[in-house]
Regions:
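Non-catalytic nucleic-acid substrate-recognition regions in nucleic-acid-modifying enzymes
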Residues: 1-26
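Conserved AdoMet
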Residues: 2, 29-108
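Helix-to-beta-strand junctions that scaffold the AdoMet/dcAdoMet cofactor pocket
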Residues: 164, 214, 240-242
Length: 299
């Protein structure tokens, strides 16, 4: 029977043959998943033998990754904003850039004069935004919506996992339609969303593991990638408080189009958060007033 070090070497070789990036690290993650151990234990236990059953399972998982299945779907987990989230093919895998959106929402909550501000996460998916906000801002009330009931099931599991299930209300429905009949007109302090924004041309250029495995409903935003933004800009004003904010994530090349589209619907961009490549990634907007705020850049 091979030891842990030999198993990783074999797994990494298979992954390298399929041109999987970070092959040895990926093999280590999969072996830890199979054995139920931490990454640090791979070093301290490298000479320890692995059972035949564990070795067979490990290599099956390696072959799944070599075939293009995302690592997060194989292990069922993804870290986001310092928390561990359950993920399945029913939900988009949380991305690091979405952490900028969470950070911005938390800053707005901190600045709010409301004793218990209401935050709505539109299209919650795995629940990574809603759960992260609820965990880190205990005074908030959180609503999370999604058109997919399978996604809501995963989001509710993540809320329970992080002990905030009783503080998040989950609603099924297509964007703002989920709020109908809830007496929420002009009641929301912060509306947050990471909507589908991949356009038709870019969809053909997505990585295979994204295009072939992640839910298209959570990725594709119409011919220009703007369909969901149009709906948000058209309908959200009826639900936000007069001094409320909408916080959205956008694609790497969408700022100019979103700036034009939002202005056409009487929204003003009051803050632009740049990602680590200095690309506009998270926008904070509010309904236009006579005294337009000065645009602020933040990192």
């Amino acid at each position: 029977m091979p030891n842990l070090s030999e198993a990783i070497t074999e797994g990494a070789a298979r992954l390298e043959h399929s041109e999987v990036a970070e092959a040895r690290r990926t093999a280590g993650v999969l072996l830890c998943h199979v054995l139920g151990i931490e990454r640090t234990q791979l070093l301290t236990r490298s000479d320890e033998s692995i059972s035949e059953a564990h070795c067979e399972l490990f290599l099956r998982l390696v072959d799944r990754r070599a075939a293009g299945e995302p690592l997060q779907y194989i292990t069922g987990h993804q870290e986001f904003y310092g928390l561990d989230f359950i993920v399945t093919p029913d939900v988009l895998i949380p991305r690091p850039e979405t952490e900028f959106l969470v950070e911005r929402v938390l800053n707005l909550i901190e600045e709010s004069k409301e004793a218990s501000p209401l935050v709505v996460d539109m299209g919650t998916g795995s629940g990574c935004i809603a759960v992260s906000v609820a965990v880190h801002a205990r005074k908030t009330r959180v609503l999370a919506t999604d058109v997919s009931r399978s996604s809501l099931d995963i989001a509710m599991k993540n809320a329970a996992k992080h002990c905030v299930r009783d503080r998040i209300e989950f609603l099924a429905g297509d964007l703002l339609a989920a709020l109908a009949g809830r007496d929420l007109e002009f009641a929301i302090d912060i509306l947050a969303s990471n909507p589908p924004y991949v356009n038709a041309a870019s969809a053909q250029e997505l990585q295979t593991e994204v295009r072939d495995w992640e839910p298209h409903a959570a990725l594709l935003g119409g011919p220009e990638g703007l369909d969901f933004y149009r709906r948000l800009f058209g309908d959200a004003a009826a639900y936000l408080k007069p001094d409320g904010f909408m916080v959205i994530e956008i694609g790497y090349d969408q700022f100019a189009a979103i700036e034009e589209l939002s202005a056409a619907h009487s929204w003003e961009i009051v803050d632009v958060t740049l990602d680590l490549q200095d690309i506009p990634r998270t926008l904070t907007l509010r309904i236009m007033s006579e005294n337009t705020a000065t645009l602020r850049l933040s990192r």
